[in-house]
């Protein structure tokens, strides 16, 4: 249904337009996107004729500073915090509204010699400032346009236009597919662009290494930062893992209540201890401790989910009632850490098939799933049964 990111990049490099869709739980819309560097009056005319939306120009913060583009409003109350600046026209234009003059304004924005005084305000081009980090920080069309431009090796600026149906309603995926077919345009998703960047870019940095004696044995501890957020992760390494042989690995998501306080609501603490003990017995392995509290929703939201469970909701229903997916974890950062450690073939300590799929999506091969089942307790029987019934965990209860 959708095209590969590589196909879209090739078309963009040729000055063509692509369609980019965002998540159905976000705006659930599609935009025409082109590279600002290659913009022509013909492309602008195509967008306004067949897209019918507002023509905007996503740019980096650097462009906005050079052109002295102030925010459109002092207090942005837009639900998605779209970073509009004041609208502009180049001083050489007349009304600024024609396709030719809009293309002129866009091209002059990219002119290194241009400065703020070269543009009238307000105007008919609407710059948008993309978040640093692109779609990995904000999954919007603004960031997608700048990311695509950078991936093409072009100036980090795009031209976007929302696609509206002839009856005035927003075009959704079925409409967008028809549009893409009609005009022979590549169609991609922001979700796929995020996955592409996670797969092709190095997002983790090895910060510090120490020797860590524990009750289970002595491990080589390696601390990692990442460029997506402020979360810091740690890998506990045992023995020589550089032989190329499959390595026993446990990817453990942080659980303060279970790991530290010994909560009986879950089996996280016992799993952590059992994994460390098993790696120690084998004399070789890795425990990767990921700061993904509460399956990615954070500590306070996990406690809120616990409160809902006390009211009769199960662990999945509680997450969804709070507005989160059942499992918000992403294994891209963890996969990059494992690859930084030189691992390729894993014997994965897990009961979760989704974790296997999540890691294998990043060119890691799970040779064997090693079960890690803990005895159920009265307090967590329902929780564990829900993980089996709704999350597909492989447990014998």
Swiss-Prot record:
Q: Where does Zn(2+) bind?
A: 255, 266, 268
Q: Which residues are D-ribulose 5-phosphate-binding?
A: 26-27, 31, 138-142, 162
**The encoding gene:** ribBA
Q: What are its GO biological-process terms?
A: riboflavin biosynthetic process
Q: Name one Pfam family in it.
A: GTP_cyclohydro2
Q: According to the record, how does the cofactor bind?
A: Binds 2 divalent metal cations per subunit. Magnesium or manganese. Binds 1 zinc ion per subunit.
Q: Which organism is the protein's source?
A: Bacillus cereus (strain ATCC 10987 / NRS 248)
Query: Region (DHBP synthase): which ranges?
Result: 1-199
Q: Which PANTHER family match?
A: 3,4-DIHYDROXY-2-BUTANONE 4-PHOSPHATE SYNTHASE, GTP CYCLOHYDROLASE II-RELATED
Residues reported to bind Mg(2+) 2: 27, 141
Q: Which GO terms describe its molecular function?
A: 3,4-dihydroxy-2-butanone-4-phosphate synthase activity; GTP binding; GTP cyclohydrolase II activity; magnesium ion binding; manganese ion binding; zinc ion binding
Site feature (Essential for DHBP synthase activity) residues: 124, 162
- Keywords tagged on the record: GTP-binding, Hydrolase, Lyase, Magnesium, Manganese, Metal-binding, Multifunctional enzyme, Nucleotide-binding, Riboflavin biosynthesis, Zinc
Question: Which protein, by its recorded name, is this?
Answer: Riboflavin biosynthesis protein RibBA
Q: List the disulfide bonds.
A: none
Record: active site: 327 (proton acceptor), 329 (nucleophile)
**What's this protein's family per the entry?**
In the N-terminal section; belongs to the DHBP synthase family.
| EC numbers | 4.1.99.12, 3.5.4.25
For region GTP cyclohydrolase II, the annotated ranges are 200-397
